[in-house]
Regions:
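DUTPase catalytic domain/fold
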Residues: 1-146
Length: 146
C-alpha cells in the first residue's frame, strides 16, 4: 500500500521501520514546545499523511518511553483517512524535575512514537432486545482473574 506524505518542515524525517518485520514505523520529532501550566510536551513531526480510505493511522508510544517521565496524552492517537494536517504527539510530563534533569524529553531528530496503519471494517449497528449468552456474561474489570 502506498501512503502519500507531505513534508511540512525542512527538517522533517520520513517515517521508518527499525526492522523490516516491524508492524509500526517510527515518527520523528522536528520541534517541541512545553506548556508548563498543563505539564504537557508537544512534539511536531513536520509531516502530514494521506491515509487511504478504509484505513486509520494509530499512534502508539514507543517502548523506550518507559525510560522518560512522559505518557502519550491520549494513550493511542487515531489519525483518520480524511485528516490532512500535521501529525503531532502530545505527552503528559509526569515528573517535571526528572524531565528537566533529562534535558527535556525529546529533541529534533528523535523518534517519538510509532504509527501503525490498519484497515477497518464497515460496521452497521443493530439495536437488539437481547444479546447472546456467553460464559463471561456481564463480568467486567478483573472478572477473569489475575
Amino acid at each position: 500500500m502506498k501512503v502519500r506524505i507531505k513534508r511540512l518542515s525542512e527538517n522533517a524525517i520520513m517515517p521508518k521501520r527499525a526492522h523490516a518485520t516491524d508492524a509500526g514505523f517510527d515518527l520523528y520529532c522536528t520541534e517541541t514546545s512545553v506548556d508548563w501550566a498543563k505539564q504537557e510536551l508537544l512534539c511536531h513531526t513536520g509531516i502530514a499523511f494521506e491515509i487511504p480510505e478504509g484505513h486509520a493511522g494509530l499512534i502508539f508510544p514507543r517502548s523506550s518511553i518507559a525510560n522518560k517521565p512522559l505518557l502519550l496524552h491520549n494513550s493511542v492517537g487515531v489519525i483518520d483517512s480524511n485528516y490532512r494536517g500535521e501529525v503531532t504527539a502530545k505527552f503528559i510530563i509526569t515528573d517535571a524535575r526528572e524531565f528537566l534533569q533529562n534535558d527535556g524529553g525529546y529533541h529534533s531528530g528523535d523518534r517519538i512514537c510509532q504509527m501503525i496503519i490498519l484497515p477497518y471494517p464497515e460496521i452497521e449497528f443493530e439495536e437488539a432486545e437481547e444479546l447472546s449468552v456467553t460464559d463471561r456474561g456481564k463480568g467486567g474489570y478483573g472478572s477473569t482473574g489475575r
